[in-house]
Amino acid sequence: MTEQTSTAPPAAPRRRRRWPWVVGIVGGLVLLGALVLAAVLIALSVGGGGFSSSSGSFTEEYVSGEGTDRVAVIPVDGTILSDNSSPEDGLPTTTPRGLESALDQAADDASVGAVVLRVNSPGGGVTPSAEMHRNILDFKAESEKPVVISMADTAASGGYYIATAADSIVAERTTLTGSLGVYIGLLNVSEAADDFGVAQNYIRSGEFKTMGDPLRELSPEEADIFQSIVDEDYEEFVNVISEGRDLPEDEVRDLADGRVYSGLQAEELNLVDRIGGLEDAVEVARDNADLEDDPTVVRYVQEPGLGSLLTSRFLPEPPEVAQLLSASGVQFNGTPQYLYVPGAIRSDLNR
């Protein structure tokens, strides 16, 4: 029997498909990039970046005048928030760090002889309002340059608080100001929670550790504690107005019952010095600083930061209910507020 051998070449080994590995690697890189981008967006959004909300230099926008002396106009727009706040509604806000940065730039510019703060704010947090008040006092003491407040549509509550640090206050006839007082907003959804059978259990270290829980009614003892905080902040507000406006404290208490005043009413009550617009405020600043007749007026402008641009483009909008609450200006975070709530709505609608 003859053995036959094949002369055909051996079959080539079958190549393994590598594309699943490639897809896996690419997918992993895409996922990693998305996570990094999300982390960057969150970090940037926490730092703010809206107008007057972050540190950094401001560009100058020419307003009027031809003189060598200059007056810097610094806008103070929107709700007053702490430096680490991150508003989600896109409304204008202002922070102590942003104001301090603008004032530092004006202090370092030898050609700037005076500053006008154009305030259009319903106020905001007690602490950031006090910080901005100190920023203005520190600027005046260190630079020896006068500061004049020019009130726009709204300069109420915390917006008025910061104004008391200025040398002069000029208000429009139609400005809404006043709302001199403090509140703490606490959300109460206890009835809705009962309807849906929702309850929250706490293991706490003290009787009042969970005071302000929105899932239950506030007890009388808890209300007294919150009221004591409001009373302390109210006394500080009265003291600031009394010192800044040279008014007796008893008279300030009569005025500071939470009501709003028009610009004309505020002038009659000595809460502002005169009626006028931005040009009038510049004139007062010029006279206070003894500048030449036609000083150059520039407005400090800060473009939206990278964080604001990226978050507004890529992050989803909050639910409609959250947007409505935020746009209303109502704060339910349990912290004291120098805030005129209807003023917040008005400021938003006028933009």
Predicted feature residues:
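N-terminal organellar transit peptides
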Residues: 1-148, 154-155, 168-171, 184-351
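Catalytic-core segments of hydrolase enzymes
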Residues: 148-149, 178
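Short gly/pro/ser/thr-enriched loop/turn and capping motifs at secondary-structure boundaries
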Residues: 155-157, 176-181
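Short alpha-helical basic/polar micro-motif
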Residues: 160-161, 264
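Hydrophobic/aromatic ligand-binding patch that stacks against planar heteroaromatic rings
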Residues: 161-162, 192
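Alpha-helix C-terminal capping segments
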Residues: 162-168
